[in-house]
Amino acid sequence: MIDLCVLGTTGGMPMVDKYLSATLININGRKILIDCGEGTQVAMRKIGWGFKSVDLICITHSHGDHTIGLPGLISIMGNSGRTEKVTVVGPKGIKEIVNGLNVINPYLPYELEIIELENNDLKFIIDKNNMSLCEDNNKCNLILSSLEVEHSAKCLSYSFYIKRRPRFSVEKASKNNVPKPLWSKLQNQEIINYDNKIYTPDLVLDNARKGIKISYVTDTRPISAIPEFIKYSDLFICEGTYGSDEDIDKAIKNKHMTFRESATLALNGECKELILTHFSPALSEPESFVDNAKQVFHNSSVAYDGLIKTLKFID
C-alpha cells in the first residue's frame, strides 16, 4: 500500500491559503519528497508523517518555489535523529544549487548524496529501515525514471514504479526439489549455492505481479515525449498552472500548461487517474475549471493542500 500527500498546490509564491507545490510519497513507512519550496516543512508537519524517514528528495528544477525550503528541511531531518544517508536527485546543476542553499548546515549527522540525472533511471531497495540505491534489478523494488522537459530552467519529470514481489509457490518449490531450508532466502531474491548446486529465485516464485506507477510532471509545456513517459500510470500528478483555455498564450510564454493540455497528456498516456496541481497564484478557485480537464480525460480532479491518496496493489 502506498500513501501520497499533495503538500502544496500553488506555484510561484506561497499564498495565505496554499503552500508551494510539493508532494510526499509514503511507501511502507519510507518517504519520497518531490520538490521543497518555502513552507514545505510546515505542510509536512501538518500531516504528521515525520521528517526522519524521508530517504529521497526529487527536485524538478532549480527555481526558488521548488527549492528554497531545502535548507530548513535538511536541518530538521538531522534534528529529528536521522543518521542514514539522504539522496537528493535533480537535473544537471542541482549539486551547485543544493550545496549553495545548504551552506547554513555545515554539520549534518547524515551523509547528503546529490545525484544529477539526465533522462536515466535509478533503482532502489526499500526495507523497513531505509531506502538505498541498488544495482541488482532482481532485488530492487523501486525504479525512479526521469525525463527532461521544456521549461525556462533545466527541469525533470519523474515516474516511480513500485515493484511487487512475486508470490511464493509451494507447488513450484516442491516440483523443483528445492530444499525447504532455502525457501525463505530464495523468496527474498537470493541466489544460493547449496550442496554443489545453484538455486535461483525463479525455482520457487510465480510470475511477476503488476506494480504501481506514479508519474509527476510539472513546469513544462506538453512535449511529445511525455505520453510515453507516463504510459499506464496508476496516478498521474500534473501541473495545471492555468485553468482557462483562454490562458493558452500565457501558458506558452511561461512554459506551463492549461488544464486541458494536462488532461490530453493523461489521455494519450492511457493513465488511470489525473490530479492537477501547481496552480497560478491568480487562480483562486481552480476547481471551477476542472470541467476543462474532464471534457478530455474524465477521471481528472483538482488537488488541494493536504490531499491524501492511497494506492493499493491489485491482485
From Swiss-Prot:
It catalyses: Endonucleolytic cleavage of RNA, removing extra 3' nucleotides from tRNA precursor, generating 3' termini of tRNAs. A 3'-hydroxy group is left at the tRNA terminus and a 5'-phosphoryl group is left at the trailer molecule. It holds the Pfam family Lactamase_B. This is Ribonuclease Z. Zinc phosphodiesterase, which displays some tRNA 3'-processing endonuclease activity. Probably involved in tRNA maturation, by removing a 3'-trailer from precursor tRNA. GO terms for molecular function: 3'-tRNA processing endoribonuclease activity; zinc ion binding. The gene is rnz. Zn(2+) 2 binds at D65, H66, D219, H278. Its EC number is 3.1.26.11. Belongs to the RNase Z family. CDD domains: RNaseZ_ZiPD-like_MBL-fold (cd07717). Its cofactor is Zn(2+). Keywords: Endonuclease, Hydrolase, Metal-binding, Nuclease, tRNA processing, Zinc. SUPFAM superfamilies: Metallo-hydrolase/oxidoreductase. Binds 2 Zn(2+) ions. Homodimer. The active site is at D65. Zn(2+) 1 binds at H61, H63, H151, D219.
